[in-house]
Amino acid sequence: MKLSILNLAPVREGQTYLQAVESMVNLAKHAENIGIERYWIAEHHNMKNLVSSATALLIQHTLANTKTLRVGSGGVMLPNHSPYVVAEQYGTLETLYPNRVELGLGRAPGTDMQTAVALRRGRNSLDFPAEIAELRGYFKDSNPVSAYPSAGLNIPFYILGSSTESAYLAAELGLPYAFASHFAPRMMEMAVEIYRKNFKPSTYLAEPYVILGVNAIVAETDKEARQLATTQTLFFLNVVTNAQQNLQPPMASEEDVWKAQMHAQEKPHFGPVDFEEIPIYNQERAVVEQMTACSLIGSPESVDFQLKQLRERVHFDEIMAVSYIFDGVYKQRAKGINHVI
């Protein structure tokens, strides 16, 4: 089984944006040293706690600071961009760093709808298959207009998704499929089964290939790993509540996270009005727990057992690990991720 890394480039509490980028590069360097398969960088917009807004620039910076590591987009949210410009950008990257660039493609906006408008997102996600065909045409140089220097280059394409719709598309195109179970695991088993059942061999890929995104936090003991994982819980709670706080230091325990959230939601009662914060709290917790259900957290032995359980549920070829660890010491982060294999 292969192991790779997805980095959303989070900004830790007390960090500048430049320091967050430096942390991203440091992790990539260590990933290269320990033989990680690939290193992808996400695309997110209008999120002050993530620095992954200009993905192609971050990929170029990472490629420039590593020697052999394959670096890619996890992914390009194609409806946000002109396929022509994407071809030019990634063709240029492949020209500068041959055989090291990968192109993961998704259809989600990676942001809210107001920001999508600011991105000039005028296309519907239903156009996604046509946009992929257009983009691939530029690399094959089969479109009426050429996009240099991408013409004739063979950059690996991957389809990203969190639904069965993306599974059908990846299968139809005969491309590798990366499922976003690190934040949307609900349809994981169904999507992977659909992809494998409907896969059509292509000139690019003879057999189906599945990458599963997982949240991975490994420490010396289960207790230490669970404490480190409170930073992950806080991160997803911020997503649910749209708080957009920077990555927070760990709390003593998971229950402390929810006690603090409950306390933060306490409101004064005015007359007969009784604000029901408990149902809101319960809903937030349920959503966070659902989003993080595909997580490998614990000692190396515990994570190995969890990984075996995951393999019994889903037929995958590669794990792509995301680690929300506040520490910021890249060796510790990469060491923890590496224990997954």
What does each model-identified segment do?
Residues 7-22, 76-84, 151-161, 219, ...:
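Active-site mouth loops of central-metabolism enzymes
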Residues 32, 59-68, 90, 94-101, ...:
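Acidic (Asp/Glu)-rich catalytic clusters
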Residues 2-17, 79-140, 177, 185:
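Flexible, glycine-rich active-site loops centered on histidine and acidic residues
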Residues 3-7, 39-41, 71-74, 101-105, ...:
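Hydrophobic faces of well-ordered beta-strands that scaffold small-molecule active sites
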Residues 1-66:
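N-terminal beta1-alpha1-beta2 module of alpha/beta enzyme domains
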Residues 165-167, 171-192, 196, 205-207:
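A conserved active-site cap/scaffold subdomain adjacent to cofactor or substrate pockets
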Residues 123-146, 187-314:
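An alpha-helical appendage that flanks or caps ligand/catalytic pockets
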Residues 3, 31, 35, 43, ...:
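Conserved, mostly hydrophobic/aromatic
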